[in-house]
Amino acid sequence: MAMMAASHDDDTVDGLATAVRGGDRAALPRAITLVESTRPDHREQAQQLLLRLLPDSGNAHRVGITGVPGVGKSTAIEALGMHLIERGHRVAVLAVDPSSTRTGGSILGDKTRMARLAVHPNAYIRPSPTSGTLGGVTRATRETVVLLEAAGFDVILIETVGVGQSEVAVANMVDTFVLLTLARTGDQLQGIKKGVLELADIVVVNKADGEHHKEARLAARELSAAIRLIYPREALWRPPVLTMSAVEGRGLAELWDTVERHRQVLTGAGEFDARRRDQQVDWTWQLVRDAVLDRVWSNPTVRKVRSELERRVRAGELTPALAAQQILEIANLTDR
């Protein structure tokens, strides 16, 4: 019976892989739901599916997009997506939101805030999986990229949502990372999270609309000066600062031309493929870390002592390092 079940699973996975490759719009969400699942039997099927589709992936340009609060990220992503479709691309939009379980996610929001893109036959929008942990969301997003590329989408836009380490996670899974910011009076770096500027490959001052155009150009000059202090003169790529009005549709072509130029520069130096290989290795170790953490959380003895250990750490009776050591010993993850 077990062999028959395995054979049936193989048939199901083969059929799903064929359907995804063929661009079946109904098969794609089924495949994505499978890779998002944390059930052990689903994880096994998902890995078999990914193994079959991996040779068909890798041809898309993966672009991460983050932004300061109020920058109009959704409007910008939709405008860029529609612009790319007009240029003959097939565009997928993913969100990385580690808070999606706690907040209820943006399952309705993604499609209502990008209404035109959501209904276009050459676009696909997928809200963040409701994993509740950044590691879980990151894993599901990386695996979803493989499915989307195998399905023929040649541009994958990955949006960061919420706060925390989502920018770093997205930067580690894309080819080009774009930071959207606003023209601000005074210090132009105000509102940009510490460290995010160093992650960016391209910086865009959005909402350069009408009377704000001059202010946006001034902000772009100030940001360019700041970036020159971060990157040495001999750097392979120094992030350019562009101005854009997503509402008016200005600057979209320049943004995408810059994304393509970034890829050309990296490819010419042999860095594009090297970056992707490094990301695969990074992904491997992230999966190891996630698996070890899952093993610790699921250990029944750890669950029994967790509250008491946390209480003692809060009370100052136990250092975090000693508490961690006890947890690892209980979970049989030390060399003692």
Swiss-Prot record:
Keywords, in A-Z order: ATP-binding, Chaperone, GTP-binding, Hydrolase, Nucleotide-binding
Residues at which GTP binds: G67, V68, P69, G70, V71, G72, K73, S74, T75, D209, S245, A246, V247
Keyword Nucleotide-binding: yes
EC number: 3.6.-.-
Protein origin, superkingdom: Bacteria
Pfam family, one: MeaB
Signal peptide annotation: none
MF term (GO), any: ATP binding
InterPro entries attached to this UniProt entry: GTPase_ArgK (IPR005129), P-loop_NTPase (IPR027417)
One GO cellular component, as annotated: cytoplasm
Subunit structure: Homodimer.
Family per record: Belongs to the SIMIBI class G3E GTPase family. ArgK/MeaB subfamily.
The protein's role, per its UniProt record: Probable GTPase. May also bind and hydrolyze ATP. May function as chaperone.
Protein name: Probable GTPase Rv1496
